[in-house]
Amino acid sequence: MKHSIAILLLIGLVSVGCRNKGCTDPLSPDFDAKAIKDNGSCTYDGRLIIWFDELSSDNMENLWINSLSVYVDGSLVGTIAVDEWTNGQPNCSNGGGVRATVNTDGADSKLVQYTVQDDLGFTIQQGTVTVSNSNCAWVEVVY
């Protein structure tokens, strides 16, 4: 009988211990407040926001450009109509522009390449930008 109780207690402790594994880093979007032991599941994301102002919008519209496509590291992350300009740099959490989530692969930051093309496929602007985890980076398209 004593052995049965000891075995049941041991099983209970093991099962509770298994449930307390997860991401223990509060800077990660995968953070689990109940986790006691880190299991390597933390990821780190930053945001890249590509935006333009009214003057650039007017200049593009005058040349019959209707929309822009934004690529980050060669992948399309969004399109935006040229009349969707913002008055100044957009807010990190909401607002205008094309927004891309960048996984920094556990590093503090990641250097990414961006390309902005018009609706005919011509490159309007391209470059590299450093995106930090849990932060925003902005690129203004000037046309």
Residue ranges of model-derived segments:
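Bacterial Sec-dependent N-terminal signal peptides
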Residues: 2-3, 12-49
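Short, intrinsically disordered, charge-biased short linear motifs at domain edges
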Residues: 4, 29-32, 77-78, 121-124
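Extracellular/mature segments of secreted proteins
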Residues: 30-32, 49-52, 100-101, 143
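Short amphipathic, basic-aromatic surface patches that mediate peripheral association
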Residues: 51-61
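Short coil-to-beta strand junction motifs in C2/discoidin
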Residues: 60-68
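Tryptophan-paired
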Residues: 71-106
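A short tyrosine-centered beta-strand micro-motif
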Residues: 103-119
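Structured interaction patches on ligand/partner-binding surfaces of diverse proteins
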Residues: 115-143
